[in-house]
Amino acid sequence: MSAERLVYVMGPSGAGKDSLLAYARKHVREPRIAFAHRYITRKSDGHENHVELTRDEFAARAQLGFFALEWSSHGFRYGVGVEIDAWLAAGSVVVVSGSRAHLPAALERYPQMCVVHIDAAPHVLAERLATRGRETADEIRARLARSVRWAVPDGVALTAIDNSGTLDDAGRVLVALLEGLARS
């Protein structure tokens, strides 16, 4: 299995990960790039590529070993299916939307993965979170405070993409990275 072809995309809430992943999904031309959806115990809002599971469904799948990666965040469970291992073994570049807090555990399973951190200026994050309408003002402030405290773990090389500007600008950077990995 070629874990260096696993691309773990993460960033603070409001950085635009889902928008960038949707952009990349639409614009990549390399057929060997696969975008894994997540399994989440949260209703889909239409802006994120995920499979909605009940807590019981998630727990059953976790117990059966159906997840390559799984974590909890903000009261929800998240998982990425073991199908990504077959995709990696077949030579695909596999893109997953991950969690910064779960990065150390993900690196234990896939130590050679490519880590991509999407970020945006604090005022852009705040504006996007408010527009999204999922959290109260206090919850938004707490999310922004966590964003400031996060630091790259020692020894992790990552690609940083600033998504403060246009989606097209940041999207082209992500697409170029993915297509470069697929050609290597």
UniProtKB/Swiss-Prot annotation:
NCBIfam families: phosphon_PhnN, PRK10078.1. Belongs to the ribose 1,5-bisphosphokinase family. SMART domains: GuKc (SM00072). SUPFAM superfamilies: P-loop containing nucleoside triphosphate hydrolases. It holds the Pfam family AAA_18. One of its GO terms (biological process) is organic phosphonate metabolic process. Keywords: ATP-binding, Nucleotide-binding, Transferase. It is an enzyme of class 2 (transferase). This is Ribose 1,5-bisphosphate phosphokinase PhnN. It catalyses: alpha-D-ribose 1,5-bisphosphate + ATP = 5-phospho-alpha-D-ribose 1-diphosphate + ADP.
